[in-house]
């Protein structure tokens, strides 16, 4: 009789477990059928608009882009860091411009954007300039720290992929306050640096910007632009600034010697022309 009682209790526990699983599945199905909220629809529209722009620009694929793709596929999350103008945002957009993420990808700029995300309607998110755009912003960090553990749980559960973009100097200031978050561990980070670009990649990037802005430059001058390059602004953005602005283009290869100096001198005008990214 004692054995029969134990068996009945085990059977009851198993039955309860089965009922709980069924109820959980029914709730999950109901959530998956929920329509998208208006905020999420707007974010998706804005994201697709950015991807359309990216495709028109026909950005140059690089070895580093392949490295980023492999890391994202293997780990489900990646932190893309580097100096201004290295192409962090472009890289992030390139990674989500994949048929497997169609209609389920969004770029987020703040925690308010994250609140609109439903993982039944989103497979991948980009957290853009997560801790500040031009300098470390403690208030942004504090806001994101409320949600980053949940985002990490979604990644671990296979419900979401995450791409974080941040300037390297800003991330270094945020590190001490990130606690045990695995999202920002070194093995999930990829640094973009112009020093990593091959000569052929730099030439392709320069040629693409010259073509885009209908500029002509002799081959020896192009070579000087590449060999002269120095500065804290990434080579990709230097090429964009150089080809897109008459004053900077008139400087010729000299611009690439001291792009920071010319950038600061013309920053207001360049911001108006939306060259900054």
Where are these regions (language model features)?
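Walker A/P-loop nucleotide-binding motif
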Residues: 74-91
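Substrate-engagement module of ASCE P-loop NTPases
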Residues: 145-160
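Charged, amphipathic alpha-helical interface modules that flank catalytic cores or transmembrane segments
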Residues: 1-67, 73, 94
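Amphipathic alpha-helical "lid/sensor" segments that cap RecA-like P-loop NTPase cores
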Residues: 19, 31, 35-36, 168-180, ...
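Residue-level preference for the first positions of well-ordered beta-strands
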Residues: 77-79, 105, 124
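Post-Walker A helix-loop "phosphate-sensing" segment adjacent to the P-loop in P-loop NTPases
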Residues: 97-107
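Conserved P-loop NTPase "ATPase switch" module shared by AAA+ and STAND
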Residues: 110-112, 118-145, 165-168
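Hydrophobic, repeat-rich solenoid/adaptor surfaces of innate immune receptors and signaling proteins
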Residues: 79, 95, 126-129, 161-168, ...
């Amino acid at each position: 009789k004692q054995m029969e009682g134990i068996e009945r209790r085990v059977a009851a526990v198993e039955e309860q477990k089965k009922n709980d699983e069924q109820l959980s599945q029914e709730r999950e199905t109901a959530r998956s059928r929920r329509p998208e909220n208006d905020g999420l629809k707007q974010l998706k529209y804005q994201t697709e608009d950015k991807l359309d722009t990216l495709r028109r620009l026909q950005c140059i694929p690089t070895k580093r882009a392949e490295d980023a793709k492999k890391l994202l596929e293997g780990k489900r999350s990646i932190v893309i860091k580097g100096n201004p103008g290295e192409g962090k945002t472009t890289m992030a957009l390139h990674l989500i411009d994949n048929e497997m993420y169609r209609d389920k990808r969004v770029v987020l700029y703040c925690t308010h954007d994250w609140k609109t995300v439903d993982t039944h309607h989103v497979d991948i998110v980009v957290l853009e300039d997560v801790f500040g755009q031009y300098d470390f912003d403690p208030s942004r960090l504090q806001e994101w720290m409320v949600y980053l553990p949940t985002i990490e749980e979604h990644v671990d559960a296979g419900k979401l992929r995450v791409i974080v973009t941040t300037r390297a100097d800003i991330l270094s200031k945020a590190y001490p306050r990130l606690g045990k978050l695995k999202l920002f561990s070194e093995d999930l980070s990829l640094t973009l640096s112009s020093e990593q670009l091959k000569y052929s990649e730099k030439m392709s990037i320069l040629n693409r910007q010259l073509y885009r802005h209908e500029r002509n430059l002799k081959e020896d001058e192009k070579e000087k632009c590449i060999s002269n390059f120095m500065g804290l602004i990434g080579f990709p953005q230097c090429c964009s600034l150089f080809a897109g602005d008459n004053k900077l283009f008139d400087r010729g290869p000299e611009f690439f010697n001291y792009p920071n100096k010319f950038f600061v001198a013309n920053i207001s005008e360049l911001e108006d022309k939306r060259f900054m990214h």
